[in-house]
Amino acid sequence: GWKKFKELSGVLCGKRWSLKLKGRVYRVCVRTVMVYGGETWVMRKEEEGVLRRAERAMVRMMSGVKLRDRKSSGELMSMAGLCEDIVLVVRRSRLRWYGHVLRKTENDGIREVLEVVVPGKVGRGRPKLGWQEEVRKDMERVGLRVGDAKDRGRWRGGAFELPS
């Protein structure tokens, strides 16, 4: 994300355009790069924090406001038109992709990969949260069930109701 931001810093950090327009350019060009492949991520709190901090820093640089100016990040984000949390964007894309996979046929390759069980010994301690558990938590937050994936409208509507 930072690489793309620095490529566009002439536009994003310049004083020529409004913060609202810079926010649109950021959302289309930089944020999409930052969340690319997010459908497959299992995000811990640390990774969520890294994404949020990076976005806040970029918006602060776009606005030209320093910390000593005492403007909150929330104010700057809303001024730039970035009211949606970046972690929420990743969760939505993960749910959208999971619905796409569930609509595939049973013998499709991606369905087989999704339902594979790796043989072998399980290590000691609590296992790390897996991708499917993360998706199940997201589904519970919006009240979706696996069977709802066949109804695209219901699934997509549920994914967009995802609370932060």
Model-identified regions with their sequence ranges:
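Short linear motifs embedded in intrinsically disordered, charge-biased segments
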Residues: 1-164
